[in-house]
Amino acid sequence: MRHWRRLALGAVAITSALSAAVAGCSSGNGHSTATTNITLKLYNDKGAWSPFFSQLGKVSKTDIGIGMSPVGYTDEPTYQAFIQASFHTNRKPDLFTWQTGGLLAEIANLHVVTNTSAIWQQGIADGDLPKGLEQYYTVAGQQYCVPLNVAYWGMFYNKHIFAKYGLTPPTTWAQFMHIAQVLKSHGQTPFYETDVLFSFVWFEQLLAGTAPDVYQALATGKASYTDPAVVNVMKMWQGMINDGYMSDPGNKTDPGVMLKTGEVAMVPDGSWFNATMTQDGMKPGSDYGYFIIPNVDSSLPKTSVILESGPLCSLTNAPDPDASTKYLKWWITAAAQQPWSTSRGDASANPKVSVTGDTDLSTVVKNAGQGQYNLLLRYFEAAPPPVLTAALDAFSAFMVSPGSYMKQLQTIQAAAQTYWSSHSAGS
């Protein structure tokens, strides 16, 4: 499932048809006083996760007397417009998924999303939420929403291809590039290149593994996209493309299918990609594996790992605020998170939850919990929305024309300068 989409907040017209659709999105006709024996509708931009949401809805019905039914979208601009339209109607979604970073700040500043500071405080005290995750859900000192999921970004690989050529997961960048060279020498495409919606993936990975301080500074306007460290990363990416290590960026085949069929040997992705693999009939440990991508710069004190966490939210004027809040409180507990993690084969925000059936991922989760990684927020959430929009287009253009890297960086920097000219750098 490719569940990120291009930012389009404010760019998609909220039509009367959408508004009419929103009018029927809630589970009730107004504020209800009942908090049991009801079913909440969870609107989300993760349509392929509907079976997993439905399973959790049955669990919650048994545990707390509140069921949950998913309403999934697969097109992000349409979904965002739909949710925004609900801010201006009398009918609201009971629960909805969103994104951290600039998008969460925007709806928090509109005062339409429920303040969950009390849930966070209790969750941290009870050991159901890690203190380190709180910062990504904080706007002006207050918390909003709770973690829908957490994912660690690494490399998924076809174990049959690795075995064929006697390859094992790398622990250094030199080993990583050696694997790519060996695969290429046998006519095997090493890496999935991503498409326009995911064009930031290789950029963030290379920069995080080379200059993590610059990576973080870009997100706060304290570094420039034309700084030497950033330019060097683009040159490195260009070299990988020119060496034939990447798949065709215009290939529309699902990356899970490409990995399964051997069209590519490796796919960089979040740990949630496990669900795609298993849905495609592949088994972790036998058909595919997962490893953390080594730093380019081996002198860095810790391996940089990209962290992704998406929010589960409710509105201040939800149809039944008490029921929605009760659901959010339940969601963060191990009673909810263990089946949620197990069903998708992914990590959980709850430290008490263990990953089952995937030794590779469980090792990564354990290492992350022990502080062995330098966890960095995914670029999609870290970059301000207007800068991200420009970057997605620029990185996509670069993949088609690698020699244009300087032009593309200048384009992104122009968007960054425009944004930070009206915002405080470091915010």
Write out the residue ranges for each language-model feature.
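Short, solvent-exposed loop/beta-turn-alpha elements that line the ligand-binding surface or hinge
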Residues: S117-L129, A211-N232, Q279-K283, N295-S304, ...
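Extracytoplasmic/periplasmic substrate-recognition and gating elements
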Residues: D243-Y245, D280-S343
